[in-house]
Amino acid sequence: MTSNADQLPQSADSVMQAADQFAQRQLVPHAAQWGRGYFERKALFEPAGAAGLMGLQVPLEWGGMALPFADKAKVLHKLAQIDFSAAMALVNSHNVVAQLVKASPHTLAPLYAGNLMRGLMVACTALTEPGAGSDLGHIQTTAVRQGEGWLLNGEKTWIINAAHADAVVVYAQTQTGSGVKGIAAFLALADTPGFERVAVTTHTALSSMGIGGLRLKNVYCDASHLVYAPGEAFVDIMAAINRARTYVAAMCC
């Protein structure tokens, strides 16, 4: 954890200035190239981390900016005016940091929040499936107890940052027939055996968004990598989807 306990949240003006400087320095020169499919991960996430943009809603004690949601939406609107795809990639990784700090401050956040906020790691959320879309009650990805952890099996598709991610929050069914009550969320690492990226056909202009699929074949997650237990994950993801509808609308304006 980065100790910023004595600091005050940055003003909205200073954050917007930092976002504008980042946009002019990194997005303007690269947007056209990325739009043709020539995306370089390090040119986006690490500079964004250095500008503080990977911690917009992360608490101060973790080194974040502790912005209210409305100011986060304003920052995303500014970035999206120049490169919507890149802005979506950034916010999706940022959202995982905020999620880990909230849900797992003693286990997962100390391991991953720092590198995610610096842009040294990239994260994504894997919900959508080929046969179920984003309908949590009908997802087919399963999580089965294995010793002290879980084995994940299934396929996700149309996932933002799937092509870039080092860490993925995977939503999976832990008990067949239990509907949303059995859904849990796990943090899976891309270097785990059985983790496979799957290409999806999309427009080259979206290359910085890293849209892709994931195939999980007996991917092992330690018990400590359970982000939300069964019964908790559904409530969290539905709230997250509602927030996303709001900030994506702001990005489109």
Language model: regions and residue ranges:
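Glycine-rich beta->alpha junctions and the first turn(s) of the following alpha-helix
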Residues: S3, V15, A199-C253
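Intrinsic disorder at enzyme termini
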Residues: M1-S11, A143
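Internal helix-loop-helix
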Residues: A50-G119, N161-A167
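A short core secondary-structure module
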Residues: N153-R197
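Short glycine/proline-enriched turns and hinge-like loops at secondary-structure junctions
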Residues: L67-F69, D135-G137, N161-A165, G179-G182, ...
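A short, Trp-centered hydrophobic/proline-enriched beta-strand micro-motif
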Residues: G119-L127
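Cytochrome P450 C-terminal beta-domain/meander region
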Residues: D135-N153
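Glycine-rich phosphate/pyrophosphate-binding beta-alpha loops
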Residues: Q81, S93, T157-A162, L206, ...
